[in-house]
Regions:
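Gly/Ser/Thr-rich phosphate-binding loop
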Residues: 1-29, 134
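Active-site glycine-centered loops adjacent to acidic/histidine catalytic or metal-binding residues
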Residues: 13, 35, 92
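Short coil-to-beta-strand transition motifs
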Residues: 36-40, 88
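A cytosolic small-molecule/anion-sensing beta-strand core signal
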Residues: 39, 98, 226
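Conserved ATP-binding/catalytic segment of the ANL
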Residues: 44-56, 60-114, 255-263
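AMP-binding/adenylate-forming catalytic core of the ANL superfamily
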Residues: 65, 70-71, 93-205, 216, ...
Length: 264
């Protein structure tokens, strides 16, 4: 946007903080960051034990100030888990740059966790896949100490139907569905070695297996909220069967019978 002459200044906030925590401004901004912490708000980055870490080290974003809520209405349990000794534990992961700029990297509850314990925030990958591929509406990644990362995909069936028509295949047939799945695989391979977006993300966190969801993500099934943001734990819950299938020998091939059926 800045290249086009449209200034866009990123910030960060929560409803629990009324809501602004940090922001860039025209006089001082740093691309990729959420800017400087609003005064007189206090902010620190803490590790899993609640100990403050050094600048540049990632951890949970923790804040304190008069703008922080006193608690959740009639929900003492949630309040106790969020506010401790006057500090609000946001549940967001990030770090502070040397100049004090805040960088937000994702939600702790959404972290991918590999079998060796390494962790990674999936949001950037998921957003890039959906934004850069016209054939994918949603991508939700999963790895909970698993041998590889799985991807749950909501395809753009309108775009894929047009794609198979251009290749003179009749939409709805098994062959057309397999052609759609092959195209989706090609889109995902663009993020791997030799692809258009090679190096954008570490390959171990890219989806090694893909499941096509049998229905869209909607507010009705609870998988997205009122602002169309993915409710990750609900996606895992609603589509548990599809997710488990991806860790079977049959599920490793994107053109498996289950995916083929869900493409119709």
């Amino acid at each position: 946007y800045c290249t086009l002459g449209i200034p866009m200044l990123q910030g960060y906030g929560l409803s629990e903080a009324s809501p602004v925590i940090s922001s860039n401004c025209p006089q001082r901004y740093r691309f990729g960051s959420s800017g400087q912490v609003v005064k007189p708000l206090e902010l620190k980055i803490c590790d899993e034990t609640g100990t403050e870490v050094k600048k540049g080290e990632k951890g949970e974003i923790v804040i304190r100030g008069k703008n922080v809520m006193k608690g959740y209405w009639k929900n003492e349990k949630s309040t106790a888990g969020t506010i401790r000794d006057g500090w609000l534990y946001t549940g967001d992961r990030g770090y502070l740059g040397e100049d004090g700029s805040l960088f937000v990297s994702g939600r702790f509850k959404s972290l991918l966790i590999a079998g060796d314990g390494e962790k990674y925030s999936p949001e950037g990958i998921e957003e890039a896949i959906a934004e850069l591929s016209p054939y994918i509406d949603y991508c939700v990644l999963y790895n909970n100490q698993s041998p590889y990362t799985a991807g749950l995909i909501v395809p753009n069936k309108t775009a894929l139907t047009e794609y198979v028509k251009q290749r003179e295949e009749e939409p709805g047939t098994v062959e057309a569905c397999k052609l759609m799945l092959t195209k989706l695989n090609e889109e995902l391979m663009k993020f791997r070695k030799g692809g258009m977006y090679e190096g954008m993300f570490p390959e171990r966190w890219l989806p090694a297996v893909v499941g096509i969801l049998p229905e869209p993500l909607t507010a009705q099934n609870g998988t997205v909220n009122s602002t169309s943001k993915v409710v990750r734990h609900k996606v895992y819950e609603v589509f548990r069967e599809e997710l488990d299938f991806l860790y079977t020998p049959e599920g490793k091939d994107i053109r498996n019978p289950r995916n083929t059926k869900n493409m119709k």
